[in-house]
């Protein structure tokens, strides 16, 4: 390796480290975050990195995801990109699709070179689209915060190439237009002006569920359909307990207070944990299937709700049950609940 290359890498690492240390000194330990597009070996410990100055079109949006997944396979736990692209100004169509992708990334920001990326600069629908995905991300924060802690403590990235989550599924080896957001959510951004979403669901012990519609789909196959701007292929892995927070107004709130635990197609056992901003575990839940019975044990000092997705219940002990569409909602929950199907 040449001396000039070594010097360049040291400069990149040292500059990111220096800025991070200044932020840490100013904001306090565990509060420093920088946005960097430069990186080299060792730069993984100074997040967040973003994709740089891409063009504002579908091709660049797609390439941004491809590069981001490659970066995270290199040990970078967090990654961001400029919603709507950076160079030039995107069409309203591209912007609205990028909003969905951007808000379902580990970090999200509106940024560009020649124009403001605020949604009302595009059209009224863009405001509605951005608002809906901001609210979704706010509700997902108990899950996303746990995912972030996993990235920090274990080195498993928050946005995962499919091959990382499904090492034994050869179909996943080359998939670079979809990803796992944490353990349980599969995201497939839309990269065309027809609104066509196409994605592959790996084979699982159970059935995948569309987050928005509740539609169930078997793994081991490809799926295609057209999506509105307020939708995106967002599939929930079977055997999942997904915590949804009680706030749509911002990312910081009491994640355990009045949380809703959504239970998706538990075949054997599934669990979830909620952590506060100081990384203390403040709630946990375990759901077990025993023949025709679901047994739920939750450790929480705050009130919570359980939503059994696509599940009908005949008898419940330890909670009050009501039917909403195809789901069963459990309220006034005790720490131990038994549900007979």
Where are these regions (language model features)?
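Small-residue (G/S/T/A) turn/hinge positions that recur once per unit in extracellular repeat modules
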Residues: 319-321
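Catalytic core of carbohydrate-active enzymes
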Residues: 20-33, 39-49, 60-63, 67, ...
């Amino acid at each position: 390796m040449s001396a000039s290359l070594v010097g360049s890498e040291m400069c990149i690492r040292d500059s990111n480290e220096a800025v991070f240390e200044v932020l840490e000194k100013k904001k306090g330990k565990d509060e420093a975050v920088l946005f960097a597009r430069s990186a080299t070996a060792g730069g993984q410990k100074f997040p967040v990195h973003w994709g740089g100055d891409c063009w504002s079109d579908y091709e660049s949006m797609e390439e941004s995801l491809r590069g981001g997944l490659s970066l995270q396979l290199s040990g970078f736990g967090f990654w961001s990109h400029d919603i709507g692209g950076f160079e030039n100004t995107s069409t309203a169509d591209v912007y609205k699709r990028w909003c969905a992708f951007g808000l379902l990334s580990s970090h999200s920001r509106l940024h560009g070179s020649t124009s403001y990326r605020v949604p009302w600069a595009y059209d009224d629908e863009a405001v509605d689209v951005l608002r809906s995905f901001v609210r979704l991300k706010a509700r997902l924060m108990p899950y996303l915060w746990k995912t972030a802690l996993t990235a920090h403590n274990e080195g498993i990235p928050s946005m995962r190439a499919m091959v990382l989550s499904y090492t034994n599924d050869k179909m996943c080896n080359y998939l670079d237009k979809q990803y796992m957001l944490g353990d349980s959510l599969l995201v497939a951004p839309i990269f065309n002006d027809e609104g066509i979403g196409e994605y592959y669901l790996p084979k699982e012990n159970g059935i995948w569920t569309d987050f928005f519609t509740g539609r169930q789909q078997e793994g081991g196959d490809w799926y295609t359909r057209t999506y509105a701007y307020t939708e995106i292929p967002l599939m929930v892995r079977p055997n999942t307990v997904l915590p949804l927070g009680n706030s749509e107004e911002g990312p910081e709130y009491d994640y355990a207070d009045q949380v809703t635990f959504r239970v998706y197609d538990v075949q054997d056992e599934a669990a979830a944990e909620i952590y506060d901003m100081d990384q203390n575990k403040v709630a946990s839940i375990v759901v077990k299937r025993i023949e025709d019975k679901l047994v739920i044990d939750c450790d929480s000092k705050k009130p919570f709700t359980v939503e059994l997705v696509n599940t009908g219940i005949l008898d419940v002990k330890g909670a009050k049950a009501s039917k909403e569409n195809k789901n069963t909602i459990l309220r006034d929950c005790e720490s131990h609940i038994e549900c007979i199907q």
